[in-house]
């Protein structure tokens, strides 16, 4: 496993910040699955009251690809939720 490219991490942070501006929280859990030899990230989006909006789990052996997958999902969720009241 190599080092995470800083541009991918910056894009991930920018995607989470867009959701924070909508008063939503992004909860991030990560672990390594030794059986499948993949890094795993579970993302949950909740409102400030703790009500679950959506959740998704991502698996990949490459951290850059994993963070790109998470960033794409967060941006997609932002596009869906920005007009939601």
UniProtKB/Swiss-Prot annotation:
Pfam families: T7-like_gp12 (PF10922)
Protein keywords: DNA replication, Early protein, Host-virus interaction
GO BP terms: DNA replication
Top-level taxon in the UniProt lineage: Viruses
InterPro entries referenced in this protein's UniProt entry, alphabetically: Phage_T7-like_1.2 (IPR020147)
Assembly and interaction partners: Interacts with host dGTPase/dgt.
Entry function: Plays a role in increasing the intracellular pool of dGTP. Interacts with and inhibits host dGTPase/dgt. The complex made of the host dGTPase and gene 1.2 protein creates a GTP-binding site of high affinity. Subsequent binding of GTP to the enzyme-inhibitor complex inhibits its dissociation.
Protein name: Inhibitor of dGTPase
Native organism: Escherichia phage T7 (Bacteriophage T7)
